[in-house]
Amino acid sequence: MNPNQKIITIGSTSLGLVVLNILLHIVSITVTVLVLPGNGNNGSCNETVIREYNETVRVERVTQWHNTNIVEYIERPESGHFMNNTEALCDAKGFAPFSKDNGIRIGSRGHVFVIREPFVSCSPTECRTFFLTQGSLLNDKHSNGTVKDRSPYRTLMSVEIGQSPNVYQARFEAVAWSATACHDGKKWMTIGVTGPDAKAVAVVHYGGVPTDVINSWAGDILRTQESSCTCIQGECFWVMTDGPANRQAQYRVFKAKQGKIIGQAEISFNGGHIEECSCYPNEGKVECVCRDNWTGTNRPVLVISPDLSYRVGYLCAGLPSDTPRGEDSQFTGSCTSPMGNQGYGVKGFGFRQGNDVWMGRTISRTSRSGFEVLKVRNGWVQNSKEQIKRQVVVDNLNWSGYSGSFTLPVELTKRNCLVPCFWVEMIRGKPEEKTIWTSSSSVVMCGVDHEIADWSWHDGAILPFDIDEM
């Protein structure tokens, strides 16, 4: 066979293979259309697959048609009912670790936000950690100067509890340098305070969209709880302050339903000071333990009824729980008046257990270091010093910070009572350490039916970071 014949033979063979390939494709398509199951059947040609992603909670409908995927995002249907939250608190013999985010340790080499004021709140299906970012990342030049409380860069964001406040899993909630958030059983409600000190605005978000606003009424740094608000049978309550941090200010409690404000009440508290309340539901009412930044080393107590009537006073216990504070032995306690004559303070919490009270406080009397919870017999109703339980959460060799309360709803636990939980913020960086930044991580503890051994679940990050040495 000469070269020309070889070329003709190879070409003819190739052409024949191409034609055969085309015929096979035609047969394949014909079989797919005519033979495989059609509408109403579970064939692989035309099917719908529902996928749920828990991190950024979205639902996808994926329609597969001839190897082509059509993705349609579906709005997540809301729950069918509001949470009740009228149950009593469960009795807690101790507090077990629920989560720890280790955000600063991870942030030395990860994309983690610079934050402060973390807090936890729960829906019927999950708990989330909320936090106020500084619009910057750890170990980055924009972290410089983040000791400042209020800036236009601060935002409220959230992650599933236990996750670090990282850029990949965080969900935007609101523009805010002060905030609160809670779930009514159907949707999340968040309140973010932002704007200039004299004309700040609180924007209410429900289901992720703005639904109402509260303008500053006293013109002096409108601010709110920095912890979970409280929803009872679809109505959500939170406390706000407007006015000086070191003398008489103005205080209001607000009530909203599905993101719309339906009531508010002025809290009359002459001679007392209320800031950064830590609130929780208990037997159909909202109980709050707050911060007196003016004079008291005992904590204000505010009990709110669904009709916005209230009782206000101070935590009766004969042990102080604010910082700075004096010696326990020199403190007498009062149910009605500030005691201790110490200015400044730190956000804290307490839980009523019948007439007893669990109260959290720093171990140090003068600085935000260490953290312990004490149970005081009759401490909710009397000036009792009888400490019946004590548990260390952070030892006094390590920094702590704010702390606050929340509860696990019965829909989540399947119990007939609300589990009391608290979180402890562990502040690192300025002003106590030689860095250019200030941020924090947190540990979360929940009430259990057993005593828990003392330990230190401290932050553990090794400072300074690379950015601090440039």
What is each PLM-predicted segment?
Residues S405-E411:
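C-terminal structured domain segments
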Residues M1-P3:
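Short, low-complexity, Lys/Arg-enriched N-terminal segments of secretory-pathway carbohydrate enzymes
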Residues I8-G40:
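Alpha-helical transmembrane segments in eukaryotic/viral proteins
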Residues G43-F113, E117-E276, Y280-V346, G350-G401, ...:
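Beta-rich carbohydrate-recognition and catalytic domains
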